[in-house]
Amino acid sequence: MNHHPNFHHYHRSRRRRAKDATWTAYDPYWLEAERAYSDHCDRFRNNATTPRIIQYPCRRGFLMPVTAAEVRATTSLVPAEFLRGLQAIFLLAGTRKQLKGACGDLFSYGFYWADCVFLHPFPLQLLCSIYSHAPKPSDLLDYARVGAEITTESAGTVVRFDRRSLKKLYLQDVLIHEIGHHADRANLGHPKENEAYARWFATEYGFRCAG
């Protein structure tokens, strides 16, 4: 069990922008995604109608709770017009630096960038986490609706995931949220507007459609 005095999950990591303060040469999530993109982008098509799904073997210490087939089945529930131009969905491997800093404030489930969705594997050490300061109510609601166990104990708020709840989190929330950023990519307004749309998108096409 991991105790996090000020631990913040980036439940739906930000859509990457050129001026994103965390988009630096030291961000291990960005570095892994950039390498994966560079390995495959020369095979992308300008007129993509459905995304490629590219899965890397998961590193020790991580769990990728979804398979390429499950991702494909989930995206089939999204109206086709929202998938046009989406080049790829990457299921990444994780890195040692990510694992070392898993309890820090840069933890990321995934993000949208360059017409691609990148999903990061989940550190096994975070399957059970203690928050001495309770997560935001909206995050607790998201954890609860995927079936995570949430309890209040003497040390703080405890969130426990099993494989089933983590799979639901990735498929119905994180993945569809990031596809929502793709659907809303022409909107260059305030980031809060982008996040509100992506959150609505995940509710509409992740939870309501997938049940």
Model-based region annotation:
Residues M1-R145, E149-R164:
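A metal-dependent hydrolase signature that marks the N-terminal structural subdomain at the beginning
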Residues T74-F82, I179, Y205-C209:
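Hydrophobic, Leu/Ile/Phe/Ala-enriched alpha-helical segments that form helix-helix packing faces
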Residues S108-G110, G180, A198, A202:
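Small-side-chain structural scaffolding
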Residues L126-S129, A183-D184, P191:
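Short catalytic/ligand-binding loop motif for oxyanion handling, primarily in non-cytosolic enzymes
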Residues D173-A186, A198:
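Active-site recognition of the HExxH zinc-binding catalytic motif
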Residues P191-G211:
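Post-HExxH zinc-binding segment in Zn-dependent metallohydrolases
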